[in-house]
Regions:
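S-adenosylmethionine
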Residues: 1-128
Length: 129
């Protein structure tokens, strides 16, 4: 996509629980972390369960926001002053994820809905302009 759009974009793959080797400051961090709870597995279509790596999908029922907490810590450390953190989220944890980001120190947090009206995305700014 970056080549097709002739955009100056740098993509990084990072273990969010071990970012000690990460360097630099970022303007935007985008993540679609695992967010489906084990309880929700029974609601998922077989074609997803059969072909998607479960490591990329599921989180423990009792720690559903663990990736968001780690992403918030990373983003606050690595984002520029007015940088953005953009996240796909579990529709059932929209309010809790917003509260988590505010409690971590983000100044602006917007919860966005998908085309079906479900909470689906968060755009958070480290500090307001």
């Amino acid at each position: 996509n970056a080549n097709a759009l002739q955009a100056e974009v740098e993509f990084k793959q990072q273990d969010i629980f071990d970012w000690s080797s990460s360097e630099g400051t970022w303007e935007v961090i985008v993540s679609n972390p695992p967010y489906v709870t084990e309880e929700e597995k029974k609601e998922m279509a077989n074609h997803v369960l059969d072909y998607e790596p479960h490591l990329a999908l599921f989180v423990p029922n009792d720690d559903a926001l663990k990736y968001y907490e780690a992403l918030a810590d990373f983003a606050l450390e690595r984002l520029s002053t007015a940088g953005y953190l953009c996240l796909e989220i579990n529709q059932y944890f929209g309010t809790q994820t917003v509260e988590l980001l505010f409690s971590k120190g983000f100044q602006e947090v917007k919860l966005l809905k998908d085309f079906k009206g479900n909470d689906r995305m968060i755009v958070a700014q480290k500090s307001g302009l």
